[in-house]
Amino acid sequence: MLLRFASFLLLIVLGLANPALAQSRLDVGAMGSSIDLAPYLQQLTTEKPEVMVELPRDATGKVGVIALKSSRSVPSYHWRILTLVNTGKIPKNLIVVIDHQKFAGSRLLYPLNPGSVVASIAHTGSVAPARISALGQDAYSLVLEPSANLSLGLEMTGTAPSALLWERDAFDSLSRSIAFFRGAILGVAVLLSV
């Protein structure tokens, strides 16, 4: 019991003492159905609408650069940068999901506006991530070939409640389940109102 507690405290201390984790690359080759992106998102705040950001080194030791260009005019720009790499042998069909700001998760005084928190998206590579329809979320579909890298820069209008990376099949299955549940609730509500 004491050994478990000591190892738990050691994990907490090591987790707090490693600020470089946010600038690491996320390997999606052996990923499960979903993963929380919070530890892998590099945060950048700047007053310039256009900025070049250095990315983490790839497997060959090269350092890449991503160009971030804002789509709006504000006093300061908030970006979240994510680098994905596929070390697996098969292409990965992935969905990056950022929850919308909801009124319930807002502040008491001067509440935040509900809705999308992603103003624009920048990427490396030739194929832009496609925006897909998702209820209460900003979702972007991308395919990562074997041995490929992809970096995304998300311009944020506020703090994202959560950000997840999903495999496409798992995301579609969850979306269908939620749609069925919402339909069942709506059907019961209609029957009760009659």
Language model features: what each stretch is:
Residues Q23-I178:
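Soluble non-transmembrane domains of integral membrane proteins
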